[in-house]
Amino acid sequence: MFNLIRRSAEWGGKTLVLESGKIARQASGAVMVSYAGTTVLATVVTGKTKEPVDFLPLTVQFVAKSYAVGKIPGGFLKREGKPSDRETLISRLIDRSIRPLFPAGFYDEISIVCNLLSYDTVTPPEVTALVGATAALSISGVPFNGLVVGARVGYLPSEGKYLLNASADEMLCSSLDLFLSGNEDSVLMVESEASELSESQMLGAITFGHQHCQEVINLIKEFSHESGQTPIDFIPHDISSLVSDIESSYKEDFSLAYSNTIKKERVLKLEELRGKVLSEVADKYSAGDVECSDQDIVTALKTFERSLVRSKIIDTSSRIDGRAFDEIRDIEIEVDVLPKAHGSALFTRGNTQALVVTALGTPQDEQIVDDLDGDRRENFLLHYNFPPYAVGESAALRAPGRREIGHGKLAWRAIRYVLPEKSDFPYTIRVVSEITESDGSSSMATVCGASLALMDTGVPIKSPVAGIAMGLIKEDDRFIILSDILGDEDHLGDMDFKVAGTAEGVTALQMDMKISGIDIDIIEKALLQAKDGRMHILSKMNAVIQESRNRIKNHAPRIESIFINKDKIRNVIGSGGKNIRDICEKTGAKIEIIQDGTVMIYAVNNEAVEYAKSMIMDIVTEPEIGKVFEGTVVEIMKFGAFVSFLGGKKGLVHISEIRNEHISSVGSVISLNDKVKVLVIGIDREHIQLSMRRVDQESGEPIDGELYNIRKNSFSDDSCGSTGGSSFKESYNPNSRHGSHEKKRSGGSSRSSRRNSNGPNYYREDLPSSNGFGNNNRSFSNSRNGHDVPRKPRFF
């Protein structure tokens, strides 16, 4: 029933298996790829387009199934829906790797779908998916010029060792995360982020990865040969005579148009000429005997324009705007351009302009990413917006597409390394790049603008980051590398090579090809030329702002973290969240408590942060003998007053500790809700004894000698309101039916000396030793039961 084809090989210490003929047999080509514990089903379907087109309608979709890791999708529908950013980025990696290998003029519709069916969270799924896509193309019959394989490369600088398809844990120690694809002879695509690596280290990683791709290319060759499927013979339509006719009639006009250095004028003139060519050539051929379609004319015109611009550059080293091959366009930089933004910068390079804005948020603003590798929180976001007006087009605004997501991720990679650690700067950082003009290299303008905006915000980045886009014109063995390419040079050239980094090294690298790859020598030259351009741009940036501002804007949110004892977390929260709600309502701050005792305070200004901080510290601070606090009278009794302080702690001010002189009634001196200053003079577990008379109620300072007397343990019974030198110790039980005061002799037993179950007993504190506060846990013999129990501190 099944015509099963199977091939396997060891690659990077793991087993790679290719299978076909069993699943998805209705597709033009289908391959099940297993690499270690990761399995991808790659399918290719091709067919004729409904209408003639002059481009390759290639669609690549990478779909990560939740069941691949045994998960059920979140959300109401509980099924896969809109592609995640990661799925989009992997789809782009595959597309950019294989697109250059289709023959020119082949315009059949091609759909490639890579379903991630099983994922071990260790093996890179993008590597497995690209192998599957290439293998499926090789047995689909689609004309495809060569085989392409991808590899993920890491680097351990301490060992000088490169890693192949390493696990996520291994990559944690890596200073490089690079994905590249290549065929037998050359490199086709690179996407990477790095920790300020040198150009030679980056080149070494590319060489290392390309060498290891050859092992799998040979495996796919064997697999394809066994299938017996050969690509169809594609013979492109011959339009050479049409190209010659256009060149002879319109070369001068197009040469003049392309010599205009002002993009807006150049674009308008070129559009006018193209319309003229399409009309006149169509009329000419319709009157003759030679059949010529509109698609043929468009293709011939593109071929002519490409040849015209490329030959001028490679023959004369003269570019469209008159610059030298390594010359950077004029740069203008402004910072702090938006007064209410937390940070902003306007970066203009020629006719490319990016308005980059930074917003700071709290950790509660972090993006929650639901990923197959596990949910995570992202505190750095970079969004890239490319509206139609940036290139003078009239079109509706749409949601971010693959291009916007890809460009934003490249800039994110370039900036991430220089950001401070979260422990040093706990803010959530969002950077938004609004491309207001575009004539090439808008993603690298985003990198420069993001670095400037972050410094304007006051984010303490390690170093400024700049980016530059390089181009390539290659004809046979002749080639020229262009610095800071224009949009037309990108469109008509052979390579888009973007490098971002600091003065110390590379932080991001991206390369896309329009031809079937380039060798390592060209990549090396491009890297070195890009370094010179990057240093030039950094010098322009440093002339405006060299380092981050030493403080964030006044209207930016404030964040402060404090550490409390883990045992005090429940006190801060309070019963049913009462305390923490009270703090938030009174201060306007947001509070986040982490299990390790870290308390994060978020507020719109410093005053709110300090207020919330003081309220929290009041709750968690333990009262100390000899310390003065401000409190509120919450209850008045015959024998004294209860005062609430330190976020709800209660202590008793005995009637003898309210005033130095005798008072007959507590209520005649103080009232409920009075704000008073109190001195802690004794502590017995939860019971706190306070004094008002020992504190200056105006200044809050202890009265001269009183603090010394407490610490020297020199209180007399007379000063506490007892009789002479009596050995009687007073205790108070507010619920006792025997009255407010009961007396017992030291060491004696009485019914009132025992703690009453109906309410707490308050005892005069034992006199502390001369060098401390005494030991309240000393034991004595209880004559009632004969057991030693902790001695109760006496109540003053």
UniProtKB/Swiss-Prot annotation:
Residues 557-616 form the KH domain. SUPFAM superfamilies: Eukaryotic type KH-domain (KH-domain type I), Nucleic acid-binding proteins, Polynucleotide phosphorylase/guanosine pentaphosphate synthase (PNPase/GPSI), domain 3, Ribonuclease PH domain 2-like, Ribosomal protein S5 domain 2-like. It catalyses: RNA(n+1) + phosphate = RNA(n) + a ribonucleoside 5'-diphosphate. GO terms for cellular component: cytosol. Mg(2+) binds at D490, D496. GO terms for biological process: mRNA catabolic process; RNA processing. Keywords: Cytoplasm, Magnesium, Metal-binding, Nucleotidyltransferase, RNA-binding, Transferase. Residues 717-796 are annotated as: Disordered. Pfam families: KH_1, PNPase, RNase_PH, RNase_PH_C, S1. Its EC number is 2.7.7.8. Residues 626-693 form the S1 motif domain. One of its GO terms (molecular function) is magnesium ion binding. Residues 785-796 have a biased composition (Basic and acidic residues). The keyword Transmembrane does not apply. Involved in mRNA degradation. Catalyzes the phosphorolysis of single-stranded polyribonucleotides processively in the 3'- to 5'-direction. This is Polyribonucleotide nucleotidyltransferase.
